[in-house]
Amino acid sequence: MTLYQIKPLFQSLLRPTMFWLHKRQVSANQITLAALALSLLTALLLALVPYPGMFLLLPIVLFIRMALNALDGMMARECNQQTRLGAILNETGDVISDIALYLPFLFLPESNASLVILMLFCTILTEFCGLLAQTINGIRSYAGPFGKSDRALIFGLWGLAIAIYPQWMQWNNLLWGIASILLLWTAINRCRSVLLMSAER
């Protein structure tokens, strides 16, 4: 069970906004680039001012980014805007945004840089394995337990927690370690889904 499974409900809530944007000539690629720009600007701010209170921004930005990611996909599919460029922007933008938004954790007190870098590497590996499924079987794998939406929820909540209770940063490395294990588990599950689908064929 992952948050990805409630995506249809989230999309239905966003559909009126999608039509409003479409009527104003906003394209899916523009929404994708807006999400990337928001992530990079937030990451730069958090890196330059690595004060725990600033991480209150993280859950807000992650939620907005999640909404923008849903909107660009919906608009591409439902408004006939699917392009190869859009697919490239979507996949690269997701990975760059993830790295950018979670990299500032490295600058927090009590954070082990090696663990944060390992976690980011595992994040990239997880997305690569999801794309690998699409390359082999034609269907992208979103297997959990620690997909993009799940990461946004956990790290957003952690940003909120350390903003309110800075002393909780003593548990930073425990979270990075657990996250890395969950990401590796997710990568393995996505590779398994490739093999299972291939076997069924």
Question: Each PLM stretch: what is its role?
Answer:
Residues 1-60, 100-201:
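Hydrophobic alpha-helical transmembrane segments
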Residues 55-87:
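Glycine-rich active-site/cofactor-binding loop and its immediate structural neighborhood
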Residues 67-75, 88, 92-96, 125-128, ...:
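Active-site His/Glu-centered metal-binding helix of metallohydrolases
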Residues 74-114:
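Basic, amphipathic juxtamembrane/active-site segments
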